[in-house]
Amino acid sequence: MLVNAKEMLDKARAGKYAVGQFNINNLEWTKAVLLTAQELNSPVILGVSEGAGKYMTGFETVSAMVAAMDKSLGITVPVALHLDHGTYEGCYKCIKAGFTSIMFDGSHFAIDENIAKTTELVSVAHGLGLSIEAEVGSIGGEEDGVIGRGECADPDECKMIADLGVDFLAAGI
């Protein structure tokens, strides 16, 4: 059952339990995560990077695969399909493809541009019943061949982005 991530995380907060996000890269990983979540009776967030989406021939393919597997495997636990660290353009592709949650990584933009793009995406996502995460500062690590040092987010900038109505905030620490 595909749901937006905010709904499941609100229930988790009220019930005092955690929800895992697992990035998927192919059919086998997706099947393993879905079956394990079902076996454990645990909601789950399936994260998809832009690189993984490209590898799996596009976000529409990913969305169709997850929806078909959810149905054919008889998954009854809540499942969110979430774009992980997406570009502005990637967010729109995932919205069109049927994802239930997006993450806009505007951390590389000046704060004014990050705010403008995040504001627009919050309006579109919420208008369609999707959850949205935004980033301030940069999270260190390597993904899709890009290595980031990480950068501490300015607390005032975090508040500015949070006040836009995002459902989750990723703050570089």
Please provide the spans of the model-predicted regions:
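Alpha/beta enzyme core
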Residues: V3-A14, N26-A52, T57-T76, H85-I173
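Short catalytic-loop micro-motif centered on adjacent basic/acidic residues
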Residues: V19-N23, L81-H82, M103
